[in-house]
């Protein structure tokens, strides 16, 4: 439902429904179908979030970015404040195929659209970031639509963070996302706590 809150904040939305569709659900179905079609054709989610897309001659905006001059653009600032970030734990992302009933440790969504996934490991239980990377490489099908849609995937443990923007099975390439070559120790917290603090601050 979060995916469409921002649509309802746009003046064109009700006009679009009235002029071109039977009801709001009919319009939403076409929006979802259009997003899926564009992703399947290789369009990047970031491009869709930034630019939206045209539907029946009207631009559909899926997200709003912070305007540079809020005093000069009240409408843009209002829409920006209607963005909704949500975090889902142990999210099942597929009901069929290779990924059936698989769960992601964390998924972050913007207006209902998945943008970030995280696989988390605890070194105290014998699992490390290496296990998280292996999980992405061997237990996450790279052609799964939801996974392909996401902008970035993080593998992390108590001390290290690795990231990739494209899953490719065994060929998935991960890059470090640490503060330094080795994350510094943090008194009373884990060395990777910056991931959570940075996210909360954003």
Task: Specify the residue positions occupied by each region the protein language model found.
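An alpha-helical interface "stripe"
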Residues: 1-202
């Amino acid at each position: 439902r979060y995916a469409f809150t921002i649509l309802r904040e746009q003046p064109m939305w009700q006009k679009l429904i009235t002029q071109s569709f039977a009801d709001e659900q009919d319009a939403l179905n076409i929006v979802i179908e259009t997003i899926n079609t564009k992703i399947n054709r290789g369009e990047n989610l970031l491009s869709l979030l930034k630019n939206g897309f045209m539907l029946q001659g009207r631009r559909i905006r899926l997200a709003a970015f912070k305007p540079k001059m809020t005093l000069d653009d009240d409408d843009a600032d209002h829409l920006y404040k209607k963005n909704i970030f949500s975090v889902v734990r142990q999210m099942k992302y597929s009901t069929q195929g290779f990924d059936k009933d698989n769960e992601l440790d964390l998924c972050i969504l913007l207006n209902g659209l998945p943008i970030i996934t995280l696989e988390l490991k605890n070194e105290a239980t014998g699992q490390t970031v290496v296990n998280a990377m292996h999980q992405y490489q061997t237990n996450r099908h790279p052609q799964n639509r939801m996974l392909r849609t996401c902008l970035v995937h993080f593998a992390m443990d108590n001390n290290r963070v690795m990231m990739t923007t494209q899953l490719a099975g065994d060929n998935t390439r991960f890059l470090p996302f640490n503060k330094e070559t080795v994350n510094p120790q943090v008194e009373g917290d884990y060395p990777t706590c910056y991931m959570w603090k940075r996210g909360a601050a954003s």
